[in-house]
């Protein structure tokens, strides 16, 4: 069995879909389907079993058997960078991860979990070293806290453990995320509604729409996860991005080009985001490459085209 926590979410459901495509249906999904629309992400997938996230953690803490488990992909978390309830965030993102990590170590089960580029905050250097880690929000801190906790164990592991620091991920099956969905999702909706894409005016010394992020295709994130599963000798914390920052203007033009029409409107930079916004991110892939991973990552032109082609063919994952 392969366990995927957050398996009905954005990256998790794409992982389940790819596992199915590779012939794996022995997948246990763990999630919280209070928001039932997430279930649509799994409508075209086959799974072996499902557990609510609270029931699952109770199950493993009680040391009840789940049968042979090949690997745990831990993607379940509160990923809202605008959430400031620290107690809620730490319970969901830190304490849950800690319990699952020890459960896997006790059973020698590979544990591949989701960290985040939010740990870097406003830094201009994005290498996996403590001196560059200064999160700007409690979400980023909750991810950093677990990375710090894990580092204490890296020299004495019983099985593979990998944390992937995701940069700005986009792709199908993110429609349930609302305001936290990628800019591709929002640009697509805006174009359909008004014929315009809205971008922030300049900030932090960047011109209008020239803020830069490392936008990474969800399919590449999934391929990297499965590469890691095939390389159990690799453990550690690694960036997951393309290694190339691109402007929001460039991303907007990639979406406009797919639709064949549209204009850009620049709107004032929100007051509540000042001092809490990453105007520049770019994954340093040196450590990932040194670990032997030679996977190529899609540029935004390819990734956006693949994304919008996919959702055009599958209304259930269409931006709305």
Swiss-Prot record:
CDD domains: ADP_GME_SDR_e. GO terms for biological process: ADP-L-glycero-beta-D-manno-heptose biosynthetic process; carbohydrate metabolic process. It holds the Pfam family Epimerase. It catalyses: ADP-D-glycero-beta-D-manno-heptose = ADP-L-glycero-beta-D-manno-heptose. Pathway: Nucleotide-sugar biosynthesis; ADP-L-glycero-beta-D-manno-heptose biosynthesis; ADP-L-glycero-beta-D-manno-heptose from D-glycero-beta-D-manno-heptose 7-phosphate: step 4/4. SUPFAM superfamilies: NAD(P)-binding Rossmann-fold domains. Disulfide bonds: none annotated. Keywords: Carbohydrate metabolism, Isomerase, NADP. Belongs to the NAD(P)-dependent epimerase/dehydratase family. HldD subfamily. This is ADP-L-glycero-D-manno-heptose-6-epimerase. It comes from Alkalilimnicola ehrlichii (strain ATCC BAA-1101 / DSM 17681 / MLHE-1). The lineage of its organism: Bacteria, Pseudomonadati, Pseudomonadota, Gammaproteobacteria, Chromatiales.
């Amino acid at each position: 069995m392969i366990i995927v926590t957050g398996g009905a979410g954005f990256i998790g459901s794409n992982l389940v879909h790819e596992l199915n495509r590779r012939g794996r249906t022995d997948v246990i999904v763990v999630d919280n389907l209070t928001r039932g629309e997430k279930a649509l992400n799994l409508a075209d997938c086959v799974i072996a079993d499902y557990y609510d996230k609270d029931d699952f953690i109770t199950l493993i803490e009680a040391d009840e058997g789940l049968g042979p488990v090949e690997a745990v992909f831990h993607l379940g978390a509160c990923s809202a960078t605008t959430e400031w309830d620290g107690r809620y965030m730490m319970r969901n993102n830190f304490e849950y991860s800690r319990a699952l990590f020890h459960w896997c170590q006790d059973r020698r089960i590979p544990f591949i979990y989701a960290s985040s580029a939010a740990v870097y905050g406003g830094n201009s250097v994005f290498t996996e070293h403590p001196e560059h880690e200064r999160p700007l929000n409690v979400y980023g801190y909750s991810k950093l806290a677990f990375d710090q906790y894990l580092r204490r164990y890296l020299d004495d592991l019983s099985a593979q453990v990998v944390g992937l620091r995701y940069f700005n991920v986009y792709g199908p099956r993110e429609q349930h995320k609302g305001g936290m969905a990628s800019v591709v999702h929002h640009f697509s909706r805006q174009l359909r509604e008004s014929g315009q894409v809205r971008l922030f005016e300049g900030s932090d010394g960047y011109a209008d729409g020239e803020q830069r992020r490392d936008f990474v295709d969800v399919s590449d994130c999934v391929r990297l996860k499965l590469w890691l599963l095939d390389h159990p000798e690799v453990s550690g914390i690694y960036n997951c991005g393309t290694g190339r920052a691109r402007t929001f203007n460039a991303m907007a033009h990639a979406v406009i080009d797919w639709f064949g029409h549209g204009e850009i409107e620049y709107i004032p930079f929100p007051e509540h985001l000042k001092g809490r916004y990453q105007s520049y991110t770019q994954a340093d892939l040196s450590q990932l490459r040194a670990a032997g991973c030679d996977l190529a990552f899609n540029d935004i032109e390819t990734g956006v085209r693949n994304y919008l082609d996919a959702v055009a063919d599958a209304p259930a994952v269409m931006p709305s």
